[in-house]
């Protein structure tokens, strides 16, 4: 479905109509395909090395299309709004193949810049998102609240407090009323019909998920890799535990190896890496277990992701540190956009921090300081002091060896164009370290 630039509804649609002969040939080819025949090659994101071609047979798609609707109540009337790249397995399966299999409607946005407008216009019921988008939308909502009159600010805070209490099963008599007063206005910005945000592609910080859930906006976090066609676990609407990625899908086995690595087995697992038999053998063992490279634990049947195995930091004193939870704590600050921890072979944990430059600029302006360029902000003494305080707050409650002892400010936001982010908005740690080698060296001194 191609969106028209005119009108308030998706309205004008153009559907490609292949000629009859090519359509017949397509149907015959589809009917002749077996479940072990190759359906597609999807390349990994390349965050930890050279991208590899993942061979996904038809069974991975047919199995998941049959099972997902038993986890999330999807229907033909649903409208999906697609903005993630179709080269990414999450969007290819859950945003393209799955809705097509059930006859749902898909709208495609023109660009990220038009996403907000398209959400109001298309009025989606389901949206696949990555954590970075939810964090960005959360920041915009909070900025809007700060500009609102005091009464509206107080109502928003009360809605958050009551909503969180309701989530935890505590007494929250005003939660429903405040959701109607506050949450409904935010939902309207998303089109007014949104049933679920489904988050994948990277770990979603618990505080971000709780922010939306407290307002009555359902965010379901799932877990999967390119190697298992994007879906292995997902939270259910009736039992949504935002600190986990939910229980496994029916037919997916999850096992935790002695070293903490998550292993997966089931009909959604790839055939292997294209023309890379050694890499395939290192990832898929003889018993059919997929070694994910992720570290996690099972909690009452739900899977919780701790970090990437390759990302674990080993300090000079031998202590192991999982960077992802600490990075998430840092990013809870309204003034920190991104954080990348370092520490291998070092005396302590250190961090490269990207400030939330727009918000920092507003903060400076309120103090009477007119500094707008990121390069200037990153070295301004007021900003350095501000971020230092935010780091100290994030360190509270951490063990001493986990605390960020030193940090530097990166003088530019991360971007896809700059190479620091993948098309699905994940941080390429290797690129960041290489691009800002001077900052890394400064932290090691």
Language-model features: locations:
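Conserved ATP-binding/catalytic segment of the ANL
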Residues: 248-315, 332
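Active-site loops of AMP-binding adenylate-forming
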Residues: 58, 204, 213-218, 225-243, ...
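ANL superfamily adenylate-forming
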Residues: 1-35, 141-185
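Conserved short alpha-helical elements in the N-terminal third of ANL/AMP-binding
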Residues: 87, 91-107, 120, 125
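Adenylate-forming
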Residues: 269, 302-331, 360-380, 400-404, ...
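Conserved AMP-binding A3 loop
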Residues: 39-65
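Conserved C-terminal "lid"/linker of ANL adenylate-forming enzymes
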Residues: 338, 388-445
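Conserved pre-ATP/AMP-binding loop-to-beta segment of ANL
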Residues: 20-43, 50, 73-79
